[in-house]
Design a protein with these regions (language model features):
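Anaerobic metallocofactor- and corrinoid-dependent redox/one-carbon enzyme cores
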Residues: 2-574
Length: 574
């Protein structure tokens, strides 16, 4: 990968890059360039450290197939590299669900719907222990039947995570079996996210679309700023919000779910620029989870005298209510202590309406416009940021091309934050260049809808609910519609697991940067043709590092409309 000439598209972030250089502060872009050139074996999935006889490598040249000490060939290495990523990503989703259920079971919060909460707690325990037999009833029978025939129906942590991890330890499983194990594990992640979203509604109430401000300009100059970083228990977040409201402490978020009725945590920035808020001098305290939080924060926080509280420490406070009150009190003390530190807050904000759900949208109108050809298809925009790309550029450019070509765009998680910064989630700016069919559809769905519809944090399974309800609207399967998922600037293993979940549901998925499987032509081929046979969809892994985002968008649009072959639905749309 070459040096990134332009680091970010975000003007609020860009103004701090020269400040960092002048101060000798190393940011994520500097550290990335310090790692170049990247290891080609690791990048293509052909390295292994699974035992102490290595590390071993293979190579992708012609028909040659260098074996590891234990006999792993390049196909096994690449497929196991993908499996390893999916296991990591799935464990992250299961950990979130486990933390949430423990918080709810502590009986420290008032439940909106106790009967529904009790039912979902039971289903969550069942998923964690026995697999997703109960929750599969919510999916189309034909989809579940394909999962059963492929052998990927979840059987719980012991049945899936433990056994899948042993595929990395040894055995004679071939690369196709490794890939099916990766899909089996990814189903656990998708179902955990769906359950977490349902449980959150039962505990806190339904999330309705909320207007909020995004970007660095939301930081306060004369008020303590407490920032929540990464995935945190919704129970703890609610307690922090309640305590902060009483003490007049401003709470905002970075890489965290912004919706928690009745509270909202306005996003300050997104993943790749998570260090930048500290450079404003206006962050008085950070509460950090583990997922989506970079270790570099701790070094930069010392420079700006900002305390960080990690909620994942081994001997941490178990009483969440007490912990929340202590956090807010420490934020106030830190604000007083840091008064002499200059606050350089850029006046850059953008309004956004976020948090739509299926209840807010008439999906029958969407299906009707699809059938009449008024819109060409639906694109699911996912993923976060990756330092290998100019921040936000790939996603924003692809979104622009989709909108111009009458493709309905829905977004989730960090992708929504990226898009919100540039006005795509602002209803007052829905006069952006839209195709006529899409413009008419959005007007028919409701007053003052933004150009792109955010379905909330990926940890809540909003996209899954959308797909299932879309299928019910016309008694079809998701794969019967012209649909695609796009991870334009993917980063974390959770996104890899989610991409496989999308494919297992029948949604052809495009993933950038290239997954570490390119060293094995057989694995690359299987992600296309094996997935098409098993699920009616493909995982597109493109290896051209210099492909411009408009070219990527054009490729996806042609696949969606059938210009490069059969439409993504697998047959002509009727």
């Amino acid at each position: 990968m070459e040096f990134i000439q332009k680091k970010t598209n975000d003007s609020a972030v860009e103004r701090f890059l020269s400040k960092a250089a002048e101060s000798g502060i190393s940011l994520v872009w500097d550290r990335y360039e310090g790692q170049l050139p990247e290891c080609g074996f690791c990048e293509s999935g052909l390295s292994c450290r699974d035992c102490l006889q290595g590390p071993c490598v293979s190579h992708p040249f012609r028909d040659s197939n260098k074996l590891g000490v234990c006999g792993k060939d390049k196909d096994i290495l690449a497929s196991q590299t993908l499996l390893r990523l999916v296991i990591k990503g799935t464990v992250a989703s299961l950990d979130q669900l486990s933390d949430f259920t423990k918080g709810v079971e502590s009986n420290k919060i008032k439940l909106k719907n106790k009967a529904k909460t009790d039912q979902l707690l039971k289903e969550s325990r069942n998923l964690l222990q026995n697999g997703g037999v109960a929750i599969t009833k919510e999916f189309p029978k034909s989809m579940v039947q394909r999962w059963e025939e492929s052998g990927i129906i979840p059987e719980g942590i012991a049945g899936d995570i433990f056994k899948a991890s042993q595929k990395l330890e040894g055995g004679i499983a071939g690369f196709e079996e490794n890939l099916l194990w990766a899909f089996k594990v990814s189903l656990l992640a998708g179902m955990a996210q769906k359950l977490q979203g349902s449980l959150k509604k039962a505990v806190f109430g339904n999330t309705s679309p909320a207007k909020m401000e995004v970007n660095l300009g939301i930081l306060k100059k004369e008020t303590p700023n407490l920032l929540l970083y990464g995935s945190l228990s919704p129970v703890l977040k609610q307690m922090i919000a309640e305590a902060a409201e009483k003490k007049k402490v401003h709470v905002a978020g970075v890489c965290t779910d912004p919706h928690l009725p009745p509270y909202h945590f306005s996003p300050v920035t997104n993943y790749v620029s998570q260090e930048i808020p500290l450079m404003s001098g206006a962050v008085d305290l950070i509460v950090a989870g583990d997922q989506f939080v970079n270790p570099s924060l701790s070094h930069l926080a010392k420079y700006y005298q900002t305390p960080i509280i990690s909620v994942g420490v081994l001997n941490g406070e178990r009483d969440l209510n007490k912990l929340a009150k202590d956090i807010v009190e420490q934020a106030k003390k830190s604000f007083d202590f840091r008064r002499k530190i200059p606050r350089d807050i850029p006046e850059v904000t953008e309004s956004a309406v976020m948090g739509f759900s299926c209840e807010d949208l008439d999906l029958k109108k969407v299906v009707k416009d699809l059938s009449k050809g008024k819109i060409k298809g639906i694109a699911i925009l996912s993923g976060s940021n990756n330092v290998k790309f100019t921040q936000d550029r790939e996603l924003v450019t692809i979104a622009q091309e989709f909108l111009k070509n009458d493709i309905l765009c829905i977004s989730e998680g960090e992708a929504s934050i990226s898009l919100a910064k540039y006005g795509f989630l602002n209803p007052s700016k829905n006069d952006m260049e839209l195709g006529k069919g899409l413009s008419d559809l959005l007007r028919s769905l409701g007053k003052a809808l933004p150009s792109i519809l955010d379905l909330g944090s990926s940890e809540n399974g909003g996209v899954t609910d959308f797909l299932l309800n879309l299928a019910k609207a016309d008694k079809k399967e998701p794969r019967d519609y012209p649909l695609l998922a796009c991870f334009a600037e993917a980063n974390r293993s959770t996104e890899v697991a989610e991409a496989l979940w999308m494919v297992a549901m029948g949604i052809s998925t495009y993933f950038w940067p290239s997954l570490p499987v390119s060293g094995s032509p057989k694995t690359m081929e299987a992600l296309s043709h094996l997935c098409q046979e098993q699920f009616g969809s493909k995982l597109h892994v493109l290896t051209d590092k210099k492909m411009e985002p408009r070219i990527k968008a054009d490729l996806m649009i042609k696949d969606l409309t059938g210009e490069r072959g059969p439409r993504l639905s697998g047959h002509p749309w009727k």
